[in-house]
């Protein structure tokens, strides 16, 4: 039986925009904070993927997992095409998720 909760599929990148990491979480603010601090070892931490570029919300975990799996199979150009309408300038969306001041966030992420 499926449970209804909040799940997010998201894309983060590094300061050079050279890596696109796709993940899924049930707590986007917590997970973005983990990426930004680098406290969770793994691919995203190794490549310093700390800037949130894109996210989607789902109410069912099965749908979020399916979408994450789908996006991970996409080419880089297709992922860029997905990001562009929501975030054409590739700005870090983390401050709006974390409730941070935009100016202070820019200082911390450089």
List the predicted regions and their residue ranges.
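GIY-YIG nuclease catalytic motif and its immediate N-terminal context
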Residues: 1-41, 45-57, 62-69, 86-88, ...
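Short arginine-rich
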Residues: 46, 69-82
């Amino acid at each position: 039986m499926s449970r209804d909760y909040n799940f997010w599929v998201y894309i983060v990148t590094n300061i050079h925009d050279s890596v696109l990491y796709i993940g899924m979480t049930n707590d986007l603010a917590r997970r973005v904070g983990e990426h930004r601090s680098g406290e969770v070892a793994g691919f995203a931490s190794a490549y310093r993927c700390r800037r949130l570029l894109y996210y989607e919300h789902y109410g069912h975990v099965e749908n979020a997992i399916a979408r994450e799996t789908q996006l991970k199979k996409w080419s880089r150009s297709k992922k860029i095409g997905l990001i562009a309408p929501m975030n054409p300038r590739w700005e870090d969306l983390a401050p709006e998720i974390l409730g941070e001041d935009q100016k202070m966030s820019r200082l911390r992420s450089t």
